[in-house]
């Protein structure tokens, strides 16, 4: 059974917890008799976060009150065909009393690409592991930054394990500085349940240039790209379906970052004061270094040339193609400095939050 049900009076935070515990991406909102009132999807929650809803808000404020659903009697193949046509990941199955029997996921009948009822939308993943990690020296004098250990496991091994868990088995790792340490450890990836191919950067190619060295003929569907210094518990399948359902060319995962201004801020128009806001907080969505990219965009990246992800974003926007942001509520950190490395190690040793695989 895929059914996860909550009350309309439960909070958004409760819905997030229910999704994370169940490894699902859709919860049914029901009354006391189990009659469907609406649904809350992983995407609904993330769109609410973009709109600055508080996590203590009742789910009745963000739920879809007219959801797509199935009546009993359809085959699994028929339901999957309908979901795919409508670019929907999942839908509840109702009985004649409008009570929820189950939730059908588009990946439920596919072998080899499912995890907990989910199907990966990604044809491949690329781990960008070619950086030097200069700010972490001397720790990186003879070791690439992604091979640094946090909680007894290297950063990049955590990524490989997470990708495998989410059904993403086709992995490319871009390497340059001390790249042999990575290839010697993972080899072909078979001992980790994945297939790994290495992309050698002979020179610095920026944050996206190495993608031009990957043949898009070796996989189908969009690619997942993740920086090699990121530790996260993001649900890659939720990210993939968010990208798919929004029909985007490129999707950017982003973390909420709050800046507290320690002073009263004067609001003005020219020399005229309009008011004072005492010690305001500003919220920003910051790039998490995780992307979903349609495979045809790879051919638009200059071959073996320096090219940053910001350049790719600008190109897609210039071509008037769609880019969406995927706000994360999962654990995330990037290991860019010694202080960040030490903080992550302390978090894992204290088991702060649900950060272990």
Write out the residue ranges for each language-model feature.
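Bateman (tandem CBS) regulatory domains
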Residues: 1-4, 11, 57-67, 140-143, ...
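The conserved cystathionine-beta-synthase
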Residues: 5-23, 30, 49, 69-88, ...
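A glycine-centered beta-loop-beta connector
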Residues: 19-22, 27-44, 83, 91-109, ...
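A short, polar/charged loop-to-alpha-helix boundary motif
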Residues: 45-60, 107-122, 285
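N-terminal glycine-rich phosphate-binding loop and ensuing alpha1 helix
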Residues: 117-180
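Conserved N-terminal catalytic core of the sugar/cofactor nucleotidyltransferase
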Residues: 153-227, 238, 303-304
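Catalytic-core segments of class I nucleotidyltransferases/pyrophosphorylases
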Residues: 224, 231, 237-244, 257-260, ...
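A short, conserved acidic/glycine-rich loop-to-beta-strand motif
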Residues: 246-256
